[in-house]
Amino acid sequence: MKKLLSMALASTLLLGALTGCGFTDSSSQNPSGGGDDTSGGTRDTLVYYVSNEIRTLVPWGASDTQSFTILNNAFEGLYRLDANHEPQPALAESYTVSDDGLVYTFTLREGLQWSNGTPLTANDFVFSWLKQMSSDATNGYNFIMTDYVVNGLEYGEGTATADQVGVKALDDRTLEVTIKNPTPYFLYLTTLSMYFPLNEAYVTEQGENYGITADNMIYCGPYTITSYDPAVGTSMVKNETYWDAANVSIPKVEVKIIKDQSSALNTYLAGGLDKVNLSSADVPTYQNDPEFHTITEFRSTYLQFNLDDPAMSNLNIRKALGYAIDRSILADTILADGSTAAEGLVSFGVSGN
């Protein structure tokens, strides 16, 4: 059985024979139970698709959804999100936090390994986090760390040294993180790909070749990448050295790049995909199909004004444009895909909203 998904509330046609831990998309961040868990036998290969090129496999260079989708399955962080979008232990088995909420001490699981058999240690997090906060990072997301980690911003600007930054390996299994201000959602941040570890010796050895091909990388997530072509897609297989490998139920994943939505739907209907997202125009055709499912995506769409423009610098003109858009009609009639009229930047369904 397959499934059709429409995506905003996302309607989708999606194969329904997946069990246990499997492949996750970029929004879930949880390859161990955050996706669809449906009845049926274990499948050998999941055939998935993304709608644009997978630009890079280099973690500190990735800024697109497609690259995040792959990295989220080939790597893992201290914590991961469960099916209810709550952080659960991943590479870390536990943590403590100081009374003032500023010092987190993470204890890594015993026996963690990279896909080449090299031990994974707290130093791998230190190296990776420093790389993400440095000028080497080209993905535009270093603020996700530098806004929180003590002296992270200064390190990136070259005014602080590595040993002054609030991330330290106390021993192979103990990572100490000092943040600037109490941050109740800090565990959520550690589920993001910017917080994933990297092996310093391997990255240094590969140099500029790191991430160019699947053979120039090692992995710590539920899957390893066996082939990669930015314009074609990737192939992935179960990572047998992954700490939770016993719960990875889908041995192989193929990720195709199909930019045209109608082509993706036709490929799905021909049996070439296990999941396809539907446009709002296709929803009426398939909404009564047993393969049709609707899921919620936490995202907002908004207008951003160029304040250097003389007209847009006028507050009243910006307000007038805001009042001129009927969000309810836009969501219910034009999009017609289950979207909700937004009242702010934080999406409905996000914790606290």
Where would I find each of the regions flagged by the language model?
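N-terminal lobe/hinge region of extracytoplasmic solute-binding protein
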Residues: Y49-D99, I218
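Surface-exposed binding/hinge segments that line
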Residues: Y141-A201
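Structural transition elements
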Residues: A341-N353
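A bilobed periplasmic-binding-protein/Venus flytrap-type ligand-binding module shared by bacterial periplasmic
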Residues: V237-T241, E297-A320, A324, T333
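Gly/Pro-rich hinge or "lid" segments in bacterial periplasmic/extracellular proteins
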Residues: I179-V248, K252
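Aromatic- and charge-enriched surface segment that lines or borders ligand/interaction sites
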Residues: E93-Y141, E176, A311
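Short, low-complexity disordered leader/linker segments with a strong preference
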Residues: M1-L46, E86, E205
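Ligand-site clamp/hinge motif
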Residues: A214, E240-P284
